[in-house]
């Protein structure tokens, strides 16, 4: 069974289109109006070993909030759809990733209980067109819509770029590991995720 999804989400504020194949490493295309966000999405999808296209149009281009939130929602929905009933997935993963002085831990459970706990000390208010207050919001919106319980904690570091990038790398690696098929069972004592 192919584990992929094609999701379009259009509101009065944005139009987001996401194609995601979590089993096939291939081309990654990302186009949003926020340059640093493009870099982070490419990083996330690369470390997931996926094939992906993300296209985001901002209909009300007065700040980056709607784009960040709506891409997170749509990408989360794409992962949830691609995983189907989650049969056979490893389900859990954690990664501790350095980027120079920064060290970030990501731990997740594909539990169908989407929530995020984000502890990042981002000292710069903006980087590459992205308000750093939207980084935790991205992770929260993504977790809620993907059904992932997500913990992200900064263990060390002071460079905002490094801290954010280590977070996206760690999330990508953790998602890759947690979505791998390890058997034919539903990994839950309830028999359903």
From Swiss-Prot:
Keywords in alphabetical order: Amino-acid biosynthesis, Cytoplasm, Histidine biosynthesis, Lyase
GO CC annotations on file: cytoplasm
Annotated GO biological process: L-histidine biosynthetic process
Predominant location category: cytoplasm
SUPFAM superfamilies in UniProt: Ribosomal protein S5 domain 2-like
GO molecular function: imidazoleglycerol-phosphate dehydratase activity
Coiled coil spans: none
Subcellular location: Cytoplasm
Annotated catalysed reactions: D-erythro-1-(imidazol-4-yl)glycerol 3-phosphate = 3-(imidazol-4-yl)-2-oxopropyl phosphate + H2O
Gene3D superfamilies: Imidazole glycerol phosphate dehydratase, domain 1 (3.30.230.40)
Keyword Cell inner membrane listed: no
This protein's pathway: Amino-acid biosynthesis; L-histidine biosynthesis; L-histidine from 5-phospho-alpha-D-ribose 1-diphosphate: step 6/9
EC number from the UniProt entry: 4.2.1.19
HAMAP family: HisB
NCBIfam families according to UniProt: PRK00951.2-4, PRK13598.1
PANTHER family in the cross-refs: IMIDAZOLEGLYCEROL-PHOSPHATE DEHYDRATASE, IMIDAZOLEGLYCEROL-PHOSPHATE DEHYDRATASE HIS7
Family note: Belongs to the imidazoleglycerol-phosphate dehydratase family.
Protein name in UniProt: Imidazoleglycerol-phosphate dehydratase
Source organism of this protein record: Saccharolobus islandicus (strain M.14.25 / Kamchatka #1)
Gene name tied to this protein: hisB
